[in-house]
Amino acid sequence: MSFTDAQKFWDDRFNTEEFIFGTEPNKFLKEATLKYLSGDLNVLCVADGEGRNSVYLAKQGFKVKAFDLSPVAVEKSKKLALKNNVNIGFFVSDCDSWKWKEDCYDAIAAIFIQFADPNMRARLFKHMISSLKPGRILIIQGYTPKQVEHKTGGPGKIENLYTKSMMIELLGGLKILELTEHEGELREGNHHIGMSALMDVVAIKPI
């Protein structure tokens, strides 16, 4: 799928008054934030959608930037941030076009970014790892291949889903603090709802 096609796909999906993934933060992101993040941190939310996760992080007092390739989603994110009285740097960008800077962020959140095919995924993980400051945290949640049985969200493409061996390879050079496969109930708007096959990941960049 080309950038133009992908942008149209997500614009069409987000083009509704409803927040399709809800306005509450991802449960695992919230848990990991409370466990690992504190202080005056610069945080990046990758492919942030309608802003539920970036708004939560900003409400914790962090300095947050977030990007998504859908202008429709970014406009909804801005409205959600305004409603919650937080300031966030929102940008329209895809993962390849984002201006990645080395050793820039104290934390990066990548929640359900499985639109990325294997080639894009490899580039994206390389960028995220490079952009983390040493000693800082990468937080990821995504679907495992078993998700295709549940059909409760996700791309439905096996090659886009996470396995433990894949994640260990992608995170080469980082210390993995959490790497857990599990099944659990998701209730995130009307598009992530029901029993789901999940992978939770937290990794730290060595000093």
Where do the model's predicted regions map?
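Conserved class I S-adenosyl-L-methionine
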Residues: 1-38
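Conserved SAM/SAH-binding beta-strand->alpha-helix loop
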Residues: 70-72
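Conserved SAM-binding strand-loop segment of SAM-dependent methyltransferases
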Residues: 84-96
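A short acidic, Gly/Pro-enriched loop at the edge of an enzyme's catalytic core
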Residues: 98-107
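A short, conserved alpha-helix within the catalytic core of class I
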Residues: 115-128
